Amino acid sequence: MIHLGVDTLCWHLRLEHGAVTLEDVLEQAASLGSDFVQVNLHHVREREIAELLTLAARADEIGLRLLVSGDFLGEGRNGDAPAVGVGRIHAWLERAVALGSSLLRVVSGFYRADLMGRPELIEAERRYVVSVLRGALPAVDAAGVALLLENHSDFTVDEYRSLVTEAGGSTGVFLDLINPIAALDDPEPVVRALAPLARAGHVKDYVFESIPTDDGYHRRGFAVRYRYPGEGVADLPRLVAALREGLGGRDFHLSVEGLDNHADVDDQRQRLAPALALLRSLVA
């Protein structure tokens, strides 16, 4: 069964500027009928453990589960030792447990486009991530938390398979249905291939925008702009169908990642409502 939720990244700039609180976000998510909120730990970085326990209790009162996202594991190519990433996971894990999360999403420290043409550096990052995941697994497994690496426009499908296999334990994939676009890949085969390894993930949408010359005679290139589900050109019915097929009936938590947010624009509720309605129709 696919459970639908929202990520606190939808409110990122408003949270950073103090326009809303995490408590406000939980109330909005509950009013939208979300099953859960994917909490990016960046948004609770200044809260003590006791405050996180209170936040988790409030979420439980209004019928929400909280799942947790950590951040970048480090950069092996720039000399980070695996202990750097392991230390980060241990710190995130304590906060994930306080929030009652059954999983911890993490990401590598690079984008493939930045290392294109440097396969030795990409392999260095792959080895680094494997070492970090292996080093963190004893504590993660002891806490009963699944450690999920997001497909973050970094590794290929085969590399993800090798990462999960070599790391072992509770390691899996946090599957973003749209991120393959950033690597100019068709997302459907990626979703189909990684779904069996995934337990949670993100969904968004995108549009392409031309970047014209000053006189408009030709374009300098194009940009990919992220949007809320249903606002762009992604074939979400096909992607959700591929996800469902790969899951084989397993539980999966899919959160809307609204990266198109602004500090002075309060539009999350009006954009999330139709996005969630669309997704509900696709997972029914």
PLM feature segments, named:
Residues 69, 150, 174-176, 203:
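Generic beta-sheet signal
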Residues 13-18, 39-51, 73-85, 114, ...:
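Acidic-and-aromatic substrate-binding clefts and catalytic sites of carbohydrate-active enzymes
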Residues 38, 67-68, 105, 199-202, ...:
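Conserved beta-strand positions in the central sheet of alpha/beta enzyme cores
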Residues 60-66, 78-172:
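Active-site acidic/histidine proton-transfer and metal-coordination neighborhood
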Residues 1-98, 272-284:
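N-terminal pre-domain/capping segments
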Residues 31-33, 98-100, 132-147, 238-250, ...:
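A structural motif corresponding to the C-terminal end of an alpha-helix
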Residues 1-10, 19-30, 157-174, 181-284:
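Histidine-acidic metal/acid-base catalytic patches
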Residues 19, 23, 49, 53, ...:
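Non-membrane alpha-helical structural segments and their capping/turn regions in soluble enzymes
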